Amino acid sequence: MLHSRDTIAIPPGATIREQLESRKISQKEFAQRMDMSEKHISHLINGKVELTHETALRLESVLGIPARFWNNMESLYREQEARAREELALEHDETMASKMPYSECAKLGWVQPTRKIAEKVHNLRRFFEVANLKVLEDMQVPGIAYRAVGESISSAYAQAMWAQKAKLDAREVQTDAININQLKASISQVRALTTSEPEDFCVELKSLFAKCGIALVFLPHLNGSFLHGATFIDGNHIVLGLTVRGKYADTFWFSLFHELGHIIHGHISSFADINENNELEANYFAQNTLIPTEKYREFLERNDFSKGEIQYFANIIGIAPGIILGRLQKENYIPYSWHNELKVMYRLSD
């Protein structure tokens, strides 16, 4: 027997059991009369096997109840069973939907606005392209790599919605075949764009990455996701998504090169979860690519963190001074109150 909040599915076997009890017939004797194994009869009574038309004819002979009665009962049971399973899935999905940032995503136009939980479930199933939301619990994007801060269990659904939107938007981007060597050869060009304005480097980045088989997409930040970016393979291209909430240049470029580090080091080609070592490796790639380790060490040894010296060093290595300032502040070489006029706030359009 299967039951949900509104439906109870009772197998024909329950009626067979009642008939046997009223006639004082054991399952063993009944199996012999039906010319079936005791195991099959047990499964039949408990609704674990289908009551076929052939079985219905045997029941008509043994119990004297018309075959059409049993066929109708079986048909009704299977219908009720399917309905109950759907209702149970809906109940489970309603719980999941209530934990997702649905209203925020509706305001962004990702899903249709509604207050009805059943409609939210329907819309979310279409958004995630799944028969039911429970599938999401066992289905992860293979080799997904993302940079998040303050991550918690409650952020998982927001991250899932953000990554799915990145995947959907990336399908609209025309890319060449994935070419990691091409990407490696383009790193210096990408780095040089740190001194450009967003309206210039956004277009250039998308073009450079498309030639490497990477679809670059910019998305709004979702509250609770704590995401700066995410990278994963979808079909025949790599999806690289970055948040576009107001952020400083140093955070933007570090996040971008962090994701590029995951791609170049092959972290997203595996079905295994991204581990701490992968994150450290991607961090090191971002740090060393933006500010070469040896040059940074020499700069630190001079122990002059004045505004002019930071600008001079930035000019020498060819990056925006705000990137150097951000790293000095993060590593506690200078207070966060120093030289913030060197920081540039990006407001990218998604």
Each model region followed by its residue ranges:
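Active-site hotspot residues in diverse enzymes, especially metal/ion-binding acidic/histidine motifs
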Residues: 2-350
